A protein has these predicted regions:
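Acidic, small-polar-rich N-terminal luminal/periplasmic segments of exported/outer-membrane proteins
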Residues: 46-183, 581
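Outer-membrane beta-barrel translocator/receptor signature
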Residues: 125-127, 139, 148-157, 162-231, ...
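Periplasmic-side early beta-strands and strand-to-turn transitions of outer-membrane beta-barrels
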Residues: 174, 182-183, 191, 203-301, ...
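Structural signature of Gram-negative outer-membrane beta-barrels, strongest in the C-terminal barrel
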Residues: 250-254, 383-384, 395-399, 442-601, ...
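Membrane-embedded beta-barrel scaffold of Gram-negative outer-membrane proteins
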Residues: 330-334, 339-355, 531-550, 554, ...
Length: 814
């Protein structure tokens, strides 16, 4: 890790120091490089022509002309604020939420919707689509990689199925990279900071054949020590170790045709991902089977009860190694008054994890890993045309995905005492569960075909009608097989008798099933927009859309008789009704922008990720919640009174709740007890309900209030004979508390927090920039999420957010 990152950092530094940007006569490059204020709507910065250009509707237009709630973040703003992945991007866009316990278990949500909170299940679609240069990335792991050579990012809020290849019910993250150029140009950047942070980026572009063939190559490497110290291994864990490379060839045989061939490769290999002890919360288990008693029985004490000591003692190997990449071929052909576009793409993802799933320093679970390999193929054809009063886009999309997973989970010598009741003599025999192993084999084949279209009819100069439709076909087939072996390698089978087998089957039960299904769905939307004035537009949208059915790829829970509940192997599709109204305004000679949107999204048969208390058997599975609603208001305000100052305030109120979920799994304080008719109070030993009614309670991971603010000021200055600007920038983000468990629990509310970032530096119009930065400047202690480990012992662990980090960046263009 260190040698690779240092090597690239050295290469980037050499390029940087040799850059003509250090010369008096350095040529000015393109605007995207040389004007650091060419950033984004909602950040107080604007393009030179006072308009933020986007392609959200598959045509080039200004963001203020799009009747849609959209945030646009320019590549320069991403670089200057250190928002180099989706996790950091959420600090700039309040209604974007990102959660990750490791690259596989990552989710991006918009307005509280998108992907269920918790462990990832390959059998469902993402509600928030991630696109890079119009190529759909089906794996949420792509959200954990560093942005590479990005020109801008558009965060589209609300359903996007009638314009995008893959149907997305909550929104889309549309990433556009910088394209090859027929003039030679390049950039180089090096950053260093505390915690051993090192990041290097470089990009070069230029002609191969004058006016016919151009190429672009970009590289990025990031490394940083972990933020949690593991006293068992002596290593800092949850480190960063990213490497990425992207190459493009642009061929323009004539004025009507351009063809782009692109390929990328990304690799991560960090020692990750662990959590820390946070607290215990009483469950309804017998007291001698709750965490304090179980730990005391084995003479175990946590290394620290203060989570922000950032200490752990997990004893299993940790690794989050994965590789992601692919290739695409894009054709744009001007045909008559329109443009035909073809995008052919292949992507892969290889996941090689190692985890500690008992979250302690005891050898309870000694191995937990689900390595996975995915291949994805997409083909999209699109035709767009713009006329005086009518613009339209029609397209066809095909998607095929195959995922193969080989899982292993193994228990150790401390498992018997931890998992078998102390009243059972077998609890004192380590050999009962030591070496007990589950081998899981999973396969998923997912095919989706779609036709879609959207038209924009300008009825008058002020009034526009925009209808859209989508016809979708989905077919999925899966396979799940779990085989169980005892410590001697003898198969453990359902129906076997004897006390030892009963204890082993209570941990792992064999199961095998092959879910499959297919479905047709029709979606549509209608948007009406009206320009009250040249810089004031109001709009309203209704969308009827869906998320395709899902299949449980991580196993299903056992029923009351201990037999796998095969009825749970599939979940119904979501049916979505979305309403939105908004106003977009610019005032003060376009120096100030104020956009307001109000929305309500009702979902029937919401695909929720729920948990049960069977230790190691099924930690999470998919189920349908009858009704869910997300509603709220978003406000984006930015101002730039002069080129010397800009500021922004983006805020949102989101009320996302289960409107009806009467048979949800219960939170830990109502779990782990007996099965009698009289239910004990929460956290009191006794009987537990089979299910809980959580109707009216909040969806996990969603803060009611979120606010992002920022400002930057600059003054003219001369440094070492170079004219430029000295600048000071501040960005802040506030989130109120949110639930961190699928069924809200008193033990897993994450408190609200405030994060402030500061940067101070000097830059020139020629593209040279040097600045120091501090992230989480006030060193706020906060959690990204809290976790409820399996077993209903009452243990709560957490993932602390980054502490204060600081460093410096030097960047140049040539």
């Amino acid at each position: 890790m260190t040698s690779r990152s240092s090597l690239l950092a050295g290469v980037a530094a050499i390029v940087l120091l040799s850059s003509p940007a250090f010369a008096e006569d350095a040529a000015t490059g393109d605007t995207s490089v040389n004007n650091p204020q060419t950033s984004s709507a909602g950040t107080g910065a604007r393009d030179d022509d006072d308009a933020i250009i986007v392609t959200a509707r598959r045509r080039t237009e200004t963001a203020q002309e799009v009747p849609l709630a959209i945030s646009v973040i320019g590549g320069e703003h991403i670089d200057s604020t250190g928002a180099f992945n989706v996790g950091r991007l959420q600090q700039l866009t309040p209604t974007l939420q990102f959660y990750s316990s490791n690259p596989r278990n990552s989710a991006a949500n918009i307005r509280g919707l998108g992907a269920p909170f918790g462990l990832t299940n390959d059998g469902i679609e993402q509600g928030v689509g991630v696109y890079v240069d119009d190529v759909y990335y089906s794996r949420a792991a792509s959200s954990t990689f560093d942005f590479l050579d990005v020109d801008r990012i558009e965060v589209l809020r609300g359903p996007q199925g009638t314009l995008y290849g893959k149907n997305t019910t909550a929104g889309a993250i549309n990433i556009t990279t910088r394209k090859p150029t027929f003039d030679f140009e390049g950039t180089a950047e090096v950053s260093i900071g505390n915690l051993g942070f090192k990041q290097a980026k470089a990009a070069v572009s230029g002609p191969v054949i004058a006016d016919k063939l151009a190429a672009r190559l970009a590289l990025s490497a990031t490394s940083r020590n972990g933020t949690i110290y593991n006293v068992t291994s002596g290593n800092y864990i949850n480190e960063q170790d990213n490497l990425g490379v992207r190459g493009q060839l642009l061929w323009e045989p004539n004025e009507d045709i351009d063809v782009t061939l692109a390929a990328d490769f990304n690799k991560q290999n960090p020692e990750c991902c662990g959590t820390v002890y946070v607290r215990t919360g009483p469950t309804q288990r017998p007291l001698n089977r709750q965490y304090e008693a179980l730990a005391a029985a084995q003479g175990y004490a946590v290394v620290s009860t203060n989570a922000f000591d950032r200490l752990t003692d997990v004893d299993a190997d940790l690794n989050a190694g994965n590789e992601l990449g692919g290739a695409s071929l894009r054709l744009n052909w001007n045909v008559g008054s329109g443009t035909f576009t073809s995008i052919t793409a292949w992507r892969f993802w290889d996941w090689k994890p190692e985890n500690d799933r008992d979250f302690t320093g005891l050898p309870i679970v000694t191995k937990s890993q689900n390595p996975s390999q995915q291949d994805q193929y997409t083909q999209e054809f699109r035709y767009s045309q713009s006329a005086k009063n009518l613009d339209f886009v029609v397209g066809a999309f095909a998607f095929h995905q195959q995922i193969d997973t080989q899982g292993t989970e193994q228990h150790g010598p401390a498992s018997s005492r931890w998992n078998i009741s102390p009243t059972n003599p077998l609890s004192n025999d380590p050999t009962v569960l030591d070496g007990l192993t589950a081998i899981n084999t999973q396969q998923l084949k997912n095919t989706s075909l779609a036709l879609y279209g959207q038209a924009s009819w300008k009825v008058t100069d002020a009034f526009t009608i925009q209808p859209g439709v989508r016809l979708n076909y989905d077919k999925k087939s899966g396979y799940y097989d779990r085989q169980v072996f005892d410590g001697a390698g003898v198969p453990v089978l359902n129906g076997q008798t004897g006390a030892r087998r009963a204890a082993q089957l209570a941990i792992f039960s064999p199961q095998s099933y092959s879910p499959e299904g297919s479905d047709w769905n029709f979606s549509y939307d209608l948007t009406l927009s009206y320009k009250i004035a040249p810089t004031v537009m109001v709009y309203g949208t209704y969308a009827k859309t869906f998320k395709s059915f899902g299949i449980n790829q991580n196993g299903v829970p056992n029923d009351a008789s201990g037999v796998p509940a095969l009825a749970a192997q599939t979940v119904r599709p979501e049916s979505v009704d979305h309403f939105e109204a908004g106003i977009k305004t610019q005032i003060w000679d376009r120096k100030a922008t104020l956009n307001i949107s109000a929305f309500r999204t009702d979902i029937k048969d919401y695909q929720a990720n729920v948990t049960n208390g069977q230790f190691g058997t099924v930690r999470g599975y998919l189920a349908n919640a009858e009704k869910v609603r997300s509603q709220g208001v978003e406000v984006d305000f930015s101002i730039r009174p002069s080129e010397r100052f800009n500021a922004y305030v983006n805020g949102s109120y989101v009320d996302a709740t289960y409107r009806k979920f009467v048979d949800a799994p219960c939170p830990p304080e109502l779990s782990g007890g007996g099965t009698g008719a009289v239910i004990a109070p929460p956290g009191v030993t006794g009987n537990s309900p089979a299910n809980c009614d959580i109707s009216g309670q909040r969806l996990p991971g969603v803060s009611r209030w979120s606010v992002s603010v920022g400002a930057e000021g600059n003054v003219p200055a001369n440094l070492l004979g170079k004219d430029g600007q000295v600048y000071l920038g501040v960005d802040g983000n506030h989130r109120t508390r949110f639930s961190s468990n699928p069924s809200p629990s008193a033990y897993t509310w994450v408190s609200g927090y405030n994060l402030w970032n500061v940067r101070f530096g000097f830059r020139t119009d020629a593209g040279f920039d040097i600045f120091g930065w501090v992230r989480n400047a006030l060193d706020e202690d906060y959690f990204e999420q809290l976790n409820v480990p399996g077993g209903n012992t009452g243990l709560i662990t957490g993932q602390p957010g980054d502490p204060r980090t600081w460093g410096a960046t030097i960047r140049a263009a040539f």
